[in-house]
Amino acid sequence: MYGILVLEDGTIIRGEGFGAETEVLGELVFNTSMTGYVEILTDPSYKGQIITMTYPLEGNYGVEKEWFESDGIKAEGFVVKDITGKELDEFLKEYNIPGISGVDTRYITRKIRSKGVIRSLLKTSTNPITKDEETELLKKVVDYPDISEIDLVPEVSTKETVIYNAEDEKTRCVLIDCGVKQSIVDCLVERGCSVVKVPYNSKKEEIISYNPDFVLVSNGPGDPENMSETVETVKNLIGMLPVTGICLGHQIITIALGGKTYKLKFGHRGGNQPVKDVESGKVYITSQNHGFATDDKIVPAGSELMHMNLNDDTVEGIRKLESSDLKNTVWSVQYHPEAGPGPHDARFLFDEMVELGIKFKAEKAN
């Protein structure tokens, strides 16, 4: 099958198509992970994006449903140097997702690194793609909006409340689902925290009705500036009970506290990002997947920098200044402590969330 990748600057990259025979538009990004292609493809944060893998060989250990981070592939397309085995090809076909192989992924990565993320079109076809078609495909790319103009979260958030009961419940969390990864839920439940997953646009009153001990705002795709409903809800929850956030949830909390976010040139996507705890000086190797960040020049008033990225000094975590009252606790991290895929250096943060919930539950009882 033929494959073609058309970039907004007019670059045409031809290769061998695999997966579904179709055509997609999206923001072209790169991921530096050496493993975890199943988790990456099924991560809802990749909605609206075509992923280029920098590691040269994909598909060499198959596909298992237990690795899924959602109910299926959420990325728009997949770009690889080489593919091996049939399972990855069949996996993409099952979810009507195109892929292209046999291309110079180093060239693509360098281009993104120097110019920034790029609007692109990926087309696969059993028929040769002509020069005349290239012109039409490029026009589609140029007309495609920037990802910040697309409201992606409604496409990946749950449509109804889902409850995950812990076997031996120690505490309860309401998770505001902006496109949550399943491993985040799993990390909480296995620690004795029951999770009530609610839609991204749930109001304060509904969230409080579940009597949670803390709230977690999840990861998800797109620009946090589009999340006005969720930001307003988080504003209303702060001061009522502890509030935490991961990735997009971190950015939403930043805005709710009065801070600002901005779009990174090419983002952080991979399992090898070093993050420093500002207070202790400890360094964690973390898994990351984001294209926006907290503006370090406008850290919310009454808050402080908690973690920073050692590659580019971007903000990786903030917290509201310490309060003796647990209900005022607010903290969030930009990276993914659950990994999925990636290192588990920061999974202790889920222990801290659960401990926070247990303490607030006891405080409420008194």
Curated annotation (Swiss-Prot):
Residues 1-168 are annotated as: CPSase. One of its GO terms (biological process) is glutamine metabolic process. Signal peptide: none annotated. Transmembrane segments: none annotated. It catalyses: hydrogencarbonate + L-glutamine + 2 ATP + H2O = carbamoyl phosphate + L-glutamate + 2 ADP + phosphate + 2 H(+). The keyword DNA damage does not apply. Its EC number is 6.3.5.5. Pathway: Amino-acid biosynthesis; L-arginine biosynthesis; carbamoyl phosphate from bicarbonate: step 1/1; Pyrimidine metabolism; UMP biosynthesis via de novo pathway; (S)-dihydroorotate from bicarbonate: step 1/3. Disulfide bonds: none annotated. Pfam families: CPSase_sm_chain, GATase. Small subunit of the glutamine-dependent carbamoyl phosphate synthetase (CPSase). CPSase catalyzes the formation of carbamoyl phosphate from the ammonia moiety of glutamine, carbonate, and phosphate donated by ATP, constituting the first step of 2 biosynthetic pathways, one leading to arginine and/or urea and the other to pyrimidine nucleotides. The small subunit (glutamine amidotransferase) binds and cleaves glutamine to supply the large subunit with the substrate ammonia. Composed of two chains; the small (or glutamine) chain promotes the hydrolysis of glutamine to ammonia, which is used by the large (or ammonia) chain to synthesize carbamoyl phosphate. Tetramer of heterodimers (alpha,beta)4. This is Carbamoyl phosphate synthase small chain. The gene is carA.
